[in-house]
Amino acid sequence: MGQTVTTPLSLTLEHWGDVQRIASNQSVDVKKRRWVTFCSAEWPTFDVGWPQDGTFNLDIILQVKSKVFSPGPHGHPDQVPYIVTWEAIAYEPPPWVKPFVSPKLSPSPTAPILPSGPSTQPPPRSALYPALTPSIKPRPSKPQVLSDDGGPLIDLLTEDPPPYGEQGPSSSDGDGDREEATSTSEIPAPSPMVSRLRGKRDPPAADSTTSRAFPLRLGGNGQKNNNPSFSEDPGKLTALIESVLTTHQPTWDDCQQLLGTLLTGEEKQRVLLEARKAVRGNDGRPTQMPNEVNAAFPLERPDWDYTTPE
């Protein structure tokens, strides 16, 4: 007797620090009083099966989310941070939530694979000389986003990439075949400084699809005073940001620095929420699936390689 029943709502209140951390990862901010009000009094009136004590059922959460994100007067923009955080908790539950989440259904058993007959291919022949495998060069690390408090923002549109040195003519003598047969392990590995200089000096090949990224140089917090406010004139600032994205192909870190420099915290949060709402699924229409939204518009730094064309 005297034992209290643990509910999803009470569980989130007991781990409120983790809830705020998850909300911060979604670039939103939540308050405890409004968290309780929306869960116990507002969302049960949507008639989608939301209980007053809350739930971690992802299907019900997505139905509430569709009501919150409804366009026009039927939407609830003030509830967006809270339902997005509920969705993140249910989609990737922390340890204290996993006991309350329904286990995923195991895949149906498949028919056993029959062993194939004896192979009719001839046995492989051993080579007289060992095969030479080319050495795999390490993937270049992501450049650090640097800032120059003294430079104006117009440098982003007029700055040219650093010049490249001319590439020396290739040797055309008859020793090419013997050089290719030489083991690559005999060539000493260049030092990190030499590799960095060489990567900036050697131009890419004619048929190469590798992209090269250069860090943006922003002018610090003074750029908010030198450019129009996004709330007052969103069209002019949007055109400026689009021109930077087109001419410089910035990385994920560059985009975060660009938004943080030109927008206020509230404006940046509104832009991120609208961008995630505009993500389209395979059918070409806006999607609400968390995995598709996070894959197309990640809020945390993704493991992307900026040297590839995609």
Swiss-Prot record:
Site feature location: Cleavage: Y129, P130, F214, P215
UniProt miscellaneous comment: This protein is synthesized as a Gag-Fos-Fox polyprotein.
The UniProt record lists the keyword Transcription: no
InterPro entries linked to this entry: G_retro_matrix (IPR000840), G_retro_matrix_sf (IPR036946), Gag_p12 (IPR002079), Gag_P30 (IPR003036), Retrov_capsid_N (IPR008919), Retroviral_Gag-Pol_poly (IPR050462), Retrovr_matrix (IPR010999)
GO cellular component, one term: viral capsid
Residue window of motif PPXY motif: 161-164
Protein's UniProt keywords contain Nucleotide-binding: no
One of the protein's GO biological processes: viral budding via host ESCRT complex
GO molecular function, one term: RNA binding
Keywords, comma-separated and alphabetical: Capsid protein, Host cell membrane, Host membrane, Host-virus interaction, Lipoprotein, Membrane, Myristate, RNA-binding, Viral budding, Viral budding via the host ESCRT complexes, Viral matrix protein, Viral release from host cell, Virion
Region: Disordered, residue numbers: 107-234, 281-310
Motif PTAP/PSAP motif boundaries: 109-112
Protein name as it appears in the record: Gag polyprotein
Species for this entry: FBR murine osteosarcoma virus
Covalent lipidation (N-myristoyl glycine), chain numbering: G2
Source superkingdom: Viruses
Cysteines engaged in disulfide bonds, as pairs: none
Motif LYPX(n)L motif boundaries: 128-132
